[in-house]
Amino acid sequence: LSVIGLTAGVAWDGYGRYRATTRLVQANEMADRLIAAAGIHAMERGVTSAVLGAVATAGPPFRKQLAELRRSGDHEWRAAIEIARRLAAGRPDDAAFASALARAERSYDVLAAMRLRVDEDLIRRAAAVLFGEWIETITVFIAANARLRELSFRSVELSQDFSQLNLSLRHSLWVISEHAGLERGTLAYYVGARRPLPPEKLDELKSFRGVVDHSIETLL
């Protein structure tokens, strides 16, 4: 009986490690896809900002580029969300992760509605979207998914050192990419509009660049 009990215990421990490893693989894939999606959505933010600032209507090349960015970014995002739903189903007690998942999905719905307004503006120059509205909407969406990515590693049983290293590195890379993207998006709008940067926007750009430079220094 003792041998049987020992064997059962070893088997149970092995199963537990297998489940933890599976969740780790899923969390890593989800995080990688969310990072990829964030980079593509940041490019969408910049291209859209440039066209919103332009005086003329957006031509077919711009609209084609924008459509491709949306398709690519959303493909990565949807794949990540499917993984997130599986992680959430496996951890029904993790309210924070479930809440972050719901917030990410809601923010996508808001972004989708904003894109419809953007499309109308790009074709008709109807002034349907203000630059600030667009930047805020897509930035909130990107940030919501960054939060989901961070919390994904709470839903797996890992050594604390590994989790923290993984999380910190990914977060630093995201901070660099996101603030550089905000810098590019703001510049793109004013270049497209052929308008000088207002003093407050120049201060914003300096702030974005400061965050990027500081984050790079912490990684070196």
Positions of predicted regions on the chain:
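Hydrophobic alpha-helical segments
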Residues: 1-220
